[in-house]
């Protein structure tokens, strides 16, 4: 149900008006104050339970100076832009419109079946007297946080304009503890650093680790979503929502005054955005609570996005899948078919005359082996990477015509393999690695999607490894952000679901476009084969990267010493086996991969049972215990079955947690199966040590579970039946 009441205080001609406005959250705990500071500078503050969260912070944008106007048919003389134009001062207060809304909506898939969208809104219209330009700042205050954006109505004095920089500030109250990755225009694939804000400059050089494409921009620049904790126990998260036709926002820190200022990703010419009024920016968001669990449970980002754009969503389904992938990531096999050709020319290189290397992973026999295992254990799909021609010189050459997305290698029979998979009751998942040659992908996109239609594919994993073509563009600039959505929308025309890797980090657009069922956009499991990730990584990601949407983290590695897969790779997966099981619950995604090799799962089939059983779509989710960088424990109720699944992970420290079961129905008995670290488990020395126990639990049960260093646990819970009468209580 939605109720909106509109109150407008218009500035009458010649009348005086206060330059300060207040907005409260529906529960009254959050308080926003907007004012015009000296010089007509828009400013805001935010308090939580009468404790300051954001100190007075500036707002607005700087525009590129106007260039001489060109007229069609006139002599063309290209002039340089004039001086930058301010849209951050010189304002007077105009109309203030207030409203409130309280409604619920049902996501196509998600952490819960229904989401409440309740907020109070204030839209402040500002007039810049010297230019006659109007700008509206729209604030929405929820019980869990704040969203605001800049809106530019249609007006003669501001129609086409170019953004030089956004001037939004977030002034912190002190030297907070932050969980951050370096600000970068091209990658989020960094390990997180936990430090005080004042230490970011000192720690930045060590935090910037090599990547296939990276452009750090500042010694104190960080990426959103940024999670912080104040000394007085407030958890503060800064991000953005509904990133459409705009550049990704980073944060640049003034580390003397602890003030963050927005920093937009530039284009090849250094400009930040090309706009045409009427238009608006994405929402800037601040989520805040004195309980870390509230940050994880917040739906602020989703609520600030537009409703679903599709009338029919029946074709969009959660997916549990395996892949011909980990063996390539670890170096056991190759994406490429041959080593005989130093360079590939599509349509010219004759692969029938090339000698196979013998290391090509996507061959008919190997793919069938994966299909057999995946089908036997109830998986929906099998990803196959390296199926298409062009991998011999795909990376590092800024090559435009690199893949055509329709031509298979000689040893990949696309028709026969899809028929074989369908006969076993599963589908193949398409792979479109673009090598960041985006123009090439767009010119082939329609043909690529039609090929998927022809052979029965309904999901695609896309990738953007390397520096972007066109040259000079960045992964997170306005042009690329428009491309990512273009790919998702065109996929929807073919009823195809998209899992985008190396794309911009999510901002809740999966609400509007639910066929965007997965993103990577962070350091995923593949880095465990590239030297490893820190154990605390998975206790931070739900507070940061997952704030904007689910992640295709690709968990489920059971053999931690990578040398057992490829003797030449001495990486180690920094997790216990029980930790890997827990990730299917703690790292929410409607797209979940069992990433390891079939032969590894066959060694631990009792533990693999949890991956078979765990659900993908949820009726409700409860965050039971949480502290960023330390631990997370989550309970989720499966949609349609009433079964519960619980997952817990810890950092590099061993810890014991006491689990409540008060979310279970009163008066009922349940059977719980616990997959836990063995007493001698350790992520470095004994990662495969686990125990499995089954027993009865109820609403009043409390259970102590010990997690090893880098460890965790997983629990499946179902209602008890008469056959379970002899089971003892779980201990």
List the model feature ranges, each with a label.
Residues 385-572, 576:
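Aromatic- and carboxylate-enriched substrate-binding clefts and catalytic-loop regions
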Residues 628-671, 713-716:
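Carbohydrate-binding surface patches
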Residues 150, 374, 498, 586, ...:
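Conserved, mostly hydrophobic/aromatic
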Residues 1-21:
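Bacterial Sec-dependent N-terminal signal peptides
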Residues 22-312, 689:
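N-terminal accessory beta-strand-rich subdomains and adjacent acidic, glycine-rich linkers
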Residues 272, 276-369, 373, 377, ...:
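An acidic-aromatic substrate-binding cleft motif
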Residues 694-731:
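C-terminal beta-strand-rich structural cap/linker in extracellular carbohydrate-active enzymes
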Residues 124, 596-645, 649, 680-686:
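Glycan-recognition and catalytic regions of carbohydrate-active enzymes
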